[in-house]
């Protein structure tokens, strides 16, 4: 019975951890929380866009 509870807890942990990666970054606070930085117009070389900060013209970029 203890093994059943352990497996259930592991399953819950795996499923809850993956749910955050499917949501897009849409504001400056969530950009910083996802290790990103708000840069006007375009992301710098070596960085990729992971969302937006204030609108479509300000992307959230991360290395």
UniProtKB/Swiss-Prot annotation:
Keyword set includes Disulfide bond: yes
Keywords (A to Z) from UniProt: Antibiotic, Antimicrobial, Defensin, Disulfide bond, Pyrrolidone carboxylic acid, Secreted, Signal
Tissue expression per record: Neutrophilic granules.
InterPro entries per UniProt: Beta/alpha-defensin_C (IPR006080), Defensin_beta-like (IPR001855)
UniProt xrefs under Pfam families: Defensin_beta
Protein's GO biological process: cell chemotaxis; defense response to bacterium
Coiled coil: none
Cellular compartment(s): Secreted
Record's keyword annotation contains Disulfide bond: yes
Span of the signal peptide: 1-22
One GO cellular component, as annotated: extracellular space
Disulfide bonds: 31-60, 38-53, 43-61
GO molecular function: CCR6 chemokine receptor binding; chemoattractant activity
Residues carrying Pyrrolidone carboxylic acid: 23
Family stated for the protein in its record: Belongs to the beta-defensin family.
Function: Has bactericidal activity. Active against E.coli ML35 and S.aureus 502A.
Descriptive protein name: Beta-defensin 4
Organism phylogeny: Eukaryota, Metazoa, Chordata, Craniata, Vertebrata
């Amino acid at each position: 019975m203890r093994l059943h509870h352990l497996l259930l807890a592991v399953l819950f942990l795996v499923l809850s951890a993956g749910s955050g990666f499917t949501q897009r970054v849409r504001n400056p606070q969530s950009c910083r929380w996802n290790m990103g930085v708000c840069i006007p117009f375009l992301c710098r070389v070596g960085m990729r866009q992971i969302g937006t900060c204030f609108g479509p013209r300000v992307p959230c970029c991360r290395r």
